[in-house]
A protein has these predicted regions:
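Acidic/polar-rich alpha-helix caps and helix-coil junctions
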Residues: 1-194
Length: 194
């Protein structure tokens, strides 16, 4: 997932996300300055051996203070996920930003934002040993949805909007937001008015 996608997830109160609210001056920083702020030192095995300037709890809070669908969709820095590659048992892993890692053409997970900061998909990706080949969805017990209820509601909302029935469009749209406790459109704050 791109940094642009992740940054589109709003704060839990519905305000647009802004890195400067978490780390003042972040938006004006160069990629190298951001790397200094967000990265840790890791050894060859992927173990964190030094925090450098990184406040990993504060970095993680930049993601957990937002729309809960972000954490369900994306593995963000300093969050946990279940890994299994090359092992016979599942391992609880932390996705950390290694200061010594440099982007290159072979590292698909490190291409965003001047070749350094990136994210991993969580939603619809199997984690750990699912008892089947991860390269073929038919060989895993993970049930991939063909159509999602939220998609149906959003399509209905779009149809109402195209038909000029904004109130009905907002009602259907808000059903999706309400499922995760996000404030509805036209629910009070100025930033939620459409």
């Amino acid at each position: 997932p791109s940094t642009q996608l992740v940054d589109m997830y709003e704060f839990k109160d519905g305000r647009p996300f802004n890195w400067d609210e978490i780390f003042p001056g972040y938006n004006a920083m160069t990629p190298e300055q951001r790397k200094e702020l967000l990265s840790v030192e890791m050894d060859g095995s992927g173990t964190i051996v030094g925090l450098r300037e990184a406040d990993t709890a504060k970095i993680l809070s930049a993601y957990t203070c937002r729309d809960p669908r972000l954490m369900a969709t994306v593995i963000v820095p300093y969050s946990h996920y279940m890994g299994n590659i090359g092992r016979t048992t599942n391992v609880d892993l932390i996705f950390a930003l290694d200061h010594n890692l440099a982007g290159n053409a072979n590292g698909g997970t490190i291409q965003n934002n001047a070749g350094w900061v990136s994210y991993l998909y969580r939603k619809f990706v199997t984690e750990g040993d699912q008892g089947g080949a991860i390269s073929n969805r038919l060989h895993t017990p993970f049930a991939f949805p063909l159509i999602r209820f939220a998609d149906v509601l959003l399509m209905l909302s779009e149809a109402y909007n195209e038909a000029g029935q904004l109130d009905k469009a907002v009602t259907e749209f808000n059903k999706v937001r309400a499922r995760v406790g996000m404030p509805g459109l036209n629910s009070g704050p100025a930033w939620m008015v459409v």
